[in-house]
Amino acid sequence: MGACISKNSSARVSRSSALSASKQTVAASAPPGAAGDETSATGAAEEASRNSLARVDGTRASAAELERAPDGVCPDREEPGTANAEQGGVTEKKDTRETLAGMNSPKTLEAEAQEDDPKREAPNQDVPSEAPEGPKEKPGGDRKPAQKAILKQDDSHTEEEKLNAHLAYREKTPADFALIQDSLKANLVCSSLNEGEIDALAVAMQFFTFKKGDVVTKQGEPGSYFFIIHSGTFDVLVNDKRVNAMDKGKAFGEIALIHNTERSATVVASSTEGALWGVQRHTFRETLKQLSSRNFAENRQFLASVKFFEMLTEAQKNVITNALVVENFKPGQPIVKEGDAGDVLYILKSGKAKVSIGGREIRMLRKGDYFGERALLYKEPRSATITAEEFTVCVSIGRELLDRVLGNLQHVLFRNIMVEALQQSKVYELFQGDQLSKLIEAAVVKDYGADYVILDKENKTKGIRFFFVLEGELSVYAYTQNPATKEEERKLAATLKRGQAFGEEYVLNPTRPFNHYVKSVGPCKLALFTSSVLTATLGGEDIDETLDFNNKRAIIRKMYIFRYLSDHQMTMLIKAFKTVRYMSGEYIIKEGERGTRFFIIKAGEVAILKNNKRLRTLGRHDYFGERALLYDKPRTASVCANSAGVDLWVVDKSVFNEIIKGPMLAHLEERIRMQDTKVEFQDLQVVRVVGRGTFGTVKLVRHVPTDIRYALKCVSRRSVIALSQQQHIRLEREIMAENDHPFIIRLVRTFRDKEFLYFLTELVTGGELYDAIRKLGLLARSQAQFYLASIVLAIEYLHERNIAYRDLKPENILLDSQGYVKLIDFGCAKKMQGRAYTLVGTPHYMAPEVILGKGYTLTADTWAFGVCLYEFMCGPLPFGNDAEDQLEIFRDILTGKLVFPHYVTDQDAINLMKRLLCRLPEVRIGCSINGYKDIKEHAFFGDFDWDKLAGRGLPPPLAPKGETYAEDTEQSSFELDEDDTIVLEDEYDWDKDF
C-alpha cells in the first residue's frame, strides 16, 4: 500500500516448501535496508562481459553484433537450447528460494530471446557434469509471515556531510582519468556506458583524502557514494572484524550508485595516507539522465531529418530512435564499401565523410546527412564507398533489427498511407478499427508502368472498387455524354498523388458499375480493394447493415454496463436488437411499470417525463432503459415519442440473460450496484482489519444503508510526510480514480481527516495470487495462460493510457470471489511523459533498463511478465533467486544466463519466457510497434481464448473457498516516537483532492 519505497514485500516461501527469499521494493526516496557491497571490489564485475549488457538509448549492441544475431534473438544472447540435456543441454536449475542470509553464490545466467519458432533445432550447448537436480514433484508449501522493513527518512546526506571533511581539490591528470575510466568500465552498473558517458562521470568524480584510522564508510549507515582507490590501502571490516584489504585501482560501494541502502561493511584507511575518487549517487544518476535525454533528443532530431521516414507516425519514429546504434569511425576508416551488400542506414551525428565512386570523390557528407536508406528496403549492393575524413560518429539501424522492432519498413510505410487516407474518408471513418485493419491487410499492392490504363469502365472483371496511390501519380477521368454528339467523352476528374485515394461512391454502392477511366502518369504503385475483399471484411455486400452494426457497437461500448463484454457477447447482443417504430405521442415506457427492455434511438426524438413533467429530450444514438436488463425494478420515468416517427433498436431482458449469464452477469450486477451507491464516510462501519502496511491499515467496512462491503485503506498523513511521499500518494489517487477495468481494483472514492487519508475501494476477497500459486504448485500451461493473460490485459489497459505500473509481481495481484485477478497497489505507478529514470520496484522483477539508470519506458512492465511466467511454471525466480544481497540480484539480471529446470518441457512457454526476458527492450516481445498483439498471438497462447477470458467464460485455476485476507497480526511497519514533532500541515495543500 502507498508508494513503493523500501518496503519488504514479503518473506517468500519456495514452492519446494522449505526455503524463502526476501524481496524488497525499492525507490530512491528511502533506504530499503538491504546489504551493501563494500566487500566486493570491482574485480567481481569483471566477470561480466561488457557486450552482454543491454545497451540503452543509443549505446546498445554494436552493428556487428546486431548483424550476427539470428532472427528473433536478442543480439547479446546465445542461441536458445531446449528443456533438458537430451534435447539440447540447457542447464537445469533448482527450485529453491533462500533467505538473504547464508545463500549460495548465484549461478551465471544469460537471458535469451528465441526465434518465433520455438521448436526449431537448437545448437548443442555444454552441459554441466553435475547438473543440479530439480524437484521430483510439484512443489507446494505454506507461506511464512511477511517481514516488514523498518522505514526511516532518507538520511543518506549523513555520509555526504562526513565526507565533506575529507574533500580536497585535485586537478585530474591523464593517469587519473585512465585509472577512473578503467575502474568504471569494469563496474557492473557502468559497464553499459559509452565512452562519452564514462568521460562525463570521470569528470564528476571528487577527490577525498584520509589518514590512518579514518572511517570512509560505516556498517549499517546509509550509503550514497561509490569509491575508487587512488592511493594507499583500506581495510574492510564486518562486525568490527577485518575481512579484506584494498589498494590502488580497487573500487567499492557500487550498490550505492543504484539506490540508497545501508553499508554492509566498514571501510577504514589503514595506511598513513590514502586517497579516493568518489561520486555520489544523485550526481551519477543525474549525469546519466542528462546525457541519455540529450542523446535521445539528438537522435530523434536526426531521424526527423530523414525524409525517408516522414510518413512514419511519432510512435514509430520513437521506436526507431530507441533502436539506433552509435558507431565511431576513425579518419580514413571506410564506413561502407562500393559493391558490398547493404542493409544498414547511417546518419552522421558528427564529423564528415567522403563519398566516392570508382575511386573518384563525388561529395562530402556532414552532420545530419544520411545514406543507405534504400538498403532498408532492397537487397542492393552499395553504389559508393563512404570513408570517414575525420573522427566521425554515426547512428545506424540495420534492416534486420528494424524488421524486428517495426516490421517490414515498406509494409509499414504503405500501411501508414492507407490508414491516413481511410481516416480522412467520410465512408471509412464509420468503420471499426479491426475492420480497417482487416481491409488494409487484404489490400492488393500492384505496380504499373507509365501511361498505363489501370481501370476502364469495361474492366468490370477486375472487381476493383477503391484504391490508394502509394507511389507515383495518376489521372482519373469521368465519363460524360456530349450534349451535341450524344457520344461518351472522358473528362479529367482528379489527379491523384501519393497518399490520396479514390472510390468511395463504389464502396457505398457495391452493385454500381465502375464508370471511370484511370491512367498512370508515370510509374506508380497502388493498393487496391476489390469487391470480394470488401464483402469478406464487411460480412456481406450491404454496407448500410455493417455501418448500422458499427453504430450500435460504438454506442454500447460507451455504456458502463456493457463496456467489458467480450467480442462474442457484444456481437450476440447487437444481433439480438430489433427495430421498432413508435408514432408521435405514443408511450414507449411508463413510469412505475416493470422494465424488461433496453432501447437505443436509431432515428427521431423522445421525451423523458416524470410525474407528467418533461425533464429532457433524447435524440439519435441516445439510449435509455439499460438497467432493466439487470434489475427487476419499476421504471423511474416515462418515455414517449416526441417526433413524427421514432425508430428504436430494442433488446429484451430474456434475450440479454441468454447472452450474458453466469460469472459475467454477477460481475456486472456487482459493479453497477457499487457505482450506483453514494457513500459518505459517516455511513461506514468497521468490521475488521484485513491488512497492514507501510502507511497504515486496510479495514473491511460495511456501508450501513446498503449493506455493501468495501475495503478502506487508511493512510497515515504523518507517515507520508515523514517519508516525503506526498507526491506519490497524490499520483496514486489520480491514477486509481481514472482506472476502470475488470482486472484492476476499483476506487470508489477518497476521504481525509486531520490524521489520515482514506482510499475506499471494492472489496477483493480471494487472497493474493502469490498464495494461490503456492497452493497450486507448478502451474500447468492452461493455468499459466489464464493468470498471465489476465495480467497482460490489465497492464495493456494501463499502457494504453501511458501509465507504467513498475511493480508487477504476484503479491500485487489479488483474486476476486470468482478467482479472477485484480491488480492492486499503484504506489509505484507513473504517468509516463517521455522516459523515466527513477529506480523503483521490487529488485527480482526489475528490468535491466530500470537498473542501469539511462532511462526506460513502458517496456519495464513487459520484462516483469517474463519473470511472473517463469515463476508460474518453473517455481523459483529467473534471476537472483539465490542471491545474497541486492547487488547480486542486479548483477544476475544484467549479466546472468536464463536456464530452465528439467521438468519444464513446454517449448512454447520457454520461447515466450526467453523473448520476454530479453535485455534489449526494443527487441523484447510486446515492445515493438505491434505492441501486445505479438504476445497475444504467440504460440504459447495459440490454444487460448482471449475473448472468453474477457467475458468471464473461462474457469479460473483456483476458485476461492470463503474469504482470504492478508494476515493482520503484525504491527504497522512505520511507527513514530510519541515525542515526534513532524508537522502535519505542509507548505502546500498536497492532499486537497482527497
Curated annotation (Swiss-Prot):
Q: Where do we find N-myristoyl glycine lipid attachment?
A: G2
**S-palmitoyl cysteine: lipidated positions:** C4
Residue numbers spanned by region cNMP-binding domain 4: 561-660
* Regulation (activators, inhibitors): Activated by cGMP. The cGMP-binding domains acts cooperatively to activate PKG. Inhibited by the antiparasitic small molecule 4-[2-(4-fluorophenyl)-5-(1-methylpiperidine-4-yl)-1Hpyrrol- 3-yl]pyridine (compound 1).
Q: Which residues form the Protein kinase domain?
A: 684-941
What result follows from mutating M103A? Loss of isoform 2 expression
| One cellular component (GO) term of this entry | apical plasma membrane
State the residue spans of region: cNMP-binding domain 3. 463-539
Map out region (Disordered) in residue numbers: 1-162, 954-976
Q: Which reaction does it catalyse?
A: L-seryl-[protein] + ATP = O-phospho-L-seryl-[protein] + ADP + H(+); L-threonyl-[protein] + ATP = O-phospho-L-threonyl-[protein] + ADP + H(+)
- GO BP term, pick one: positive regulation of cell motility
Task: Please tell me which top-level EC class this enzyme sits in.
Answer: transferase
Which residues participate in 3',5'-cyclic GMP 2 binding? R616, G625, E626, A628, R635, T636
UniProt EC number: 2.7.11.12
Keyword Phosphoprotein (UniProt): no
Q: Which Pfam families match?
A: cNMP_binding, Pkinase
**Cofactor(s) essential for the protein:** Mg(2+)
Phenotypic consequence of G2A? Loss of membrane localization
Give, from the UniProt record, the effect of changing R635A.
Answer: 77% reduction in catalytic activity. 87% reduction in catalytic activity. Complete loss of catalytic activity
- Effect on the protein of changing C4S: Partial loss of myristoylation. Loss of palmitoylation. Partial loss of membrane localization
Region: cNMP-binding domain 1; residue ranges are: 189-305
Query: What family does the entry list?
Result: Belongs to the protein kinase superfamily. AGC Ser/Thr protein kinase family. cGMP subfamily.
**Reported function:** Serine/threonine protein kinase which acts as a downstream effector of the second messenger cGMP. Plays an essential role in tachyzoite invasion of and egress from host cells. During invasion of host cells, regulates the apico-basal flux of F-actin probably via Ca(2+)-mediated activation of CDPK1. In tachyzoites, required for microneme secretion. Required for tachyzoite gliding motility.
What is the protein name for this chain? cGMP-dependent protein kinase
Q: Which gene encodes it?
A: PKG
